[in-house]
UniProtKB/Swiss-Prot annotation:
Protein family according to the UniProt entry: Belongs to the histone H3 family.
Region (H3-like): 127-238
Disordered: region residues: 83-109
Organism: Candida glabrata (strain ATCC 2001 / BCRC 20586 / JCM 3761 / NBRC 0622 / NRRL Y-65 / CBS 138) (Yeast)
Main location class: nucleus
Cellular localisation: Nucleus; Chromosome, Centromere
GO molecular-function terms, A-Z: centromeric DNA binding; protein heterodimerization activity; structural constituent of chromatin
Highest rank taxon of the organism: Eukaryota
Gene it is expressed from: CSE4
Keywords from the named record: Centromere, Chromosome, DNA-binding, Nucleosome core, Nucleus, Ubl conjugation
GO cellular component terms, A-Z: 2-micrometer circle DNA; CENP-A containing nucleosome; kinetochore; nucleus; peroxisome
Transmembrane feature ranges: none
Keyword Translocase (UniProt): no
Assembly description: Component of centromeric nucleosomes, where DNA is wrapped around a histone octamer core. The octamer contains two molecules each of H2A, H2B, CSE4/CENPA and H4 assembled in one CSE4-H4 heterotetramer and two H2A-H2B heterodimers. Interacts with the inner kinetochore.
Name of protein: Histone H3-like centromeric protein CSE4
Length: 240
């Protein structure tokens, strides 16, 4: 009888062992004269039991406590795959190796929290209720003509962009040049030249309308009239 022969027979009835534990059926076998094999078998058995306990605790933690730091999960994985360096077969107070000092780059990251059934139901109900709600049309605010005019004046005074569209202004410039130059001369305009003309034209019109508005206010009116513009041009030295 060799030293690797088991003390008790291994022909154990397979019905006594569940399907998941049949692979470990021979782990409890003790061999005579070979302490190394016995220690390895006991380590494997303890590792399997410890892995099962850790897995249950980890699942419960993720299910009921929500997000868990990645460091704790990494520590659990480390315990599950770590064999103890020294194990005393007669010591029942076995504690796993503490690897809380293991640092990870993702220790500050948190796992996504698992949805509970109540939150999911409440969220789906809110989405369903919002579908049937008809959006109320925005009420139009009615401004007095004087207030609306002053609002538009202040709006355009704050802005610095060009008020006339570029393409219609360019067409007008080309029509005027063709009228004065004649059809014999084919004149072409650069975009920068047309832009400079537009800025100068808008500056002149804005200044003229500003003076016209001041004259209308001086006459205790809001609406500008033709005579206001004529007076403004005469004061500025531009005779009609």
């Amino acid at each position: 009888m060799s030293t690797r022969q088991a003390v008790f027979e291994r022909d154990v009835d397979e019905d006594r062992w569940p399907r998941s534990a049949r692979g470990l059926a021979g782990v409890n076998t003790v061999f005579e004269g070979d302490s190394e094999i016995n220690s390895k078998a006991m380590r494997l058995l303890e590792k399997t039991r410890h892995r099962r306990n850790l897995l249950n605790r980890r699942e419960d933690r993720r299910r009921y406590l929500g997000g868990v730091k990645a460091k704790a999960i990494e520590s659990d994985y480390y315990h599950r795959n770590q064999l103890p360096s020294s194990y005393d077969a007669g010591n029942d107070d076995f504690e796993p190796i503490n690897n809380s000092h293991v640092e990870s780059e993702e220790e500050n990251k948190r796992l996504p929290e698992k949805y509970s059934l109540d939150k999911y139901v409440k969220r789906s109900r809110k989405q369903r209720d919002h579908r049937h709600i008809v959006a109320k049309p925005k009420e139009k605010r009615n401004f007095a003509p004087s207030k609306l005019a002053m609002y538009e004046i202040e709006k355009y005074q704050r802005s610095t962009a060009l008020l006339i569209q570029k393409i219609p202004f360019a067409k007008l410039v080309k029509e005027v040049t063709e009228e004065f130059a004649g059809e014999s001369q084919d004149l072409r305009w650069q975009s920068m030249a047309i832009l400079a003309l537009q800025e100068a034209s808008e500056a002149y019109l804005v200044g003229l309308l500003e003076h016209t508005n001041l004259l209308a206010l001086h006459a205790k009116r809001i609406t500008i009239m033709k005579k206001d513009m004529q007076l403004a041009r005469r004061i500025r030295g531009q005779f009609i």
